[in-house]
From Swiss-Prot:
Name listed for the protein in its UniProt record: Methionine--tRNA ligase
The keyword Plastid belongs to this UniProt entry's keyword annotation: no
Gene that produces this protein: metG
Binding site for ATP: 332
Example of a GO biological process term: methionyl-tRNA aminoacylation
Species: Bacillus cereus (strain Q1)
Amino acid sequence: MSIFIGGAWPYANGSLHLGHIASLLPGDILARYYRAKGENVLYVSGSDCNGTPIAIRAKQEGVTAKDIADQYHEEFERCFRNLGFTYDCYTRTDSEHHHETVQNVFLRLLEEGHIYKKTVEQAYCETCTQFLPDRYVEGICPHCHEAARGDQCDACSAILDPLDLLEKKCKLCGSTPSVQETEHFYFALHTFQEQIKTAVENVKQTGTWRDNAIQLTERYVKEGLQDRAVSRDLPIGVPIPVEGYEDKKIYVWIEAVTGYYSASKHWAEKTGEDDQEFWDSEAKTYYVHGKDNIPFHSVIWPAVLLGIGEGAIPRHIVSNEYLTVEKRKLSTSKNWAVWVPDILERYDPDSIRYFLTVNAPENRDTDFSWREFIYSHNSELLGAYGNFVNRTLKFIEKYYGGIVPKGSIDVELKDKVEGLYKHVGEAIEQTKFKVALESIFDAVRFANKYFDEKQPWKQREDNPVSCEETIYNCVYLIANFVNLLEPFLPFSSERIRNTLSIVNRNWESQHTLPSRIDSVQPLFERIDVKQIEHEVEKLYGAVK
């Protein structure tokens, strides 16, 4: 089976925060799982280097947009690598290959009659003497009356036209823009109304889109899909490939989502592989992002794919809700955020991955609390999982000289483990990652109970053969926890693999156990709870 996984592209205008990771982490869990299953996986993403936020940041700092994009693209790559993300291709939207692919898609849509020219009114700043891209216009949402940008309202998820905003202001200088006529290209989104409606009806039956994606897309369909501009007067971006319009750029809402396609083509070019199987209707596709990106993946991207004749419209939409920080809405402008480069300097990446999975905002907003983060590490990763692994391997090291005793696998344990592979696998495929991880940790707690009830420290004296059986079965459980937890906790899984010399990474019950173990080191270190107060003080102290 061909599995395509697309992770949303973060804007390269500032550091990643935990809200980004909470929405993107499911993509890596899926990729690791399906590779272990032996499926053909293509997992792609990249940095959005063409967006208006980058141009604004560059203007504020007095540097070029490329300077900003380079800085954060490199930081993103480093953060994703240090968090264990296993992208097959992580690229950027200001690359030549991306520009070429996007222009080709634009021309195909134009040739098929899905793009047309239209004279429209657009916000123009007399002070800055320029037409204003949508994100350069800020004001009040006409639907919910909250503060909004010219392209979208984060409060109610409405896709907006800048001229719809109330109390419009230029983001650059704060003046009220005028309205002038200009010519732009438009995407005939309304012509895909019935196909998008059918797609939503289908996923309501299969349950392969998150509820928030279904509800929001149904709302758009009910209101009637509106044609959208595909060109803008932007300072950076992909030039319109039509003579006489080269000074205009392809609008980022269609250009950025086409990044999945351009990354796929770039991967194929680099590896010599054929990527077409990932764009056929039989492909199993997952798009992983936050709920603010839903309409771009549930309406616009499917319409673009249909418009160019590709069959792989999004089968799974993994659109997480929002992550708050210490019960407050995350705000980058106010510096109310936990920044990824910062937390990675001091904490185990598996601790971050664990907390953002068991506490994932899958169906509702959830909160990142330093207290909960540190206590979950100490109680679950260290106290449950680390404790079981350490007490078993230390027992072998102390009483068997590092040689794993001989034994036979308990039938009940074998059935439990094989059932766990099936249950966890199904949960991952259904994008129920929290359920999957909690199921494994239920088994970890069962394993600790098994160790306690068998009391190998007593068996060793009273019944050495039973002791060997107990320890052998504990090693069997550890070897399988390593595989089951690989998609979630890859770093600790790798450490145990090295200790036990486990080579097999397949998603199946491990029956061949190691004969000996190498030097045993603690799997996790205890975090001093005094860190809670320190981290909270640091967070409040950084607020602007």
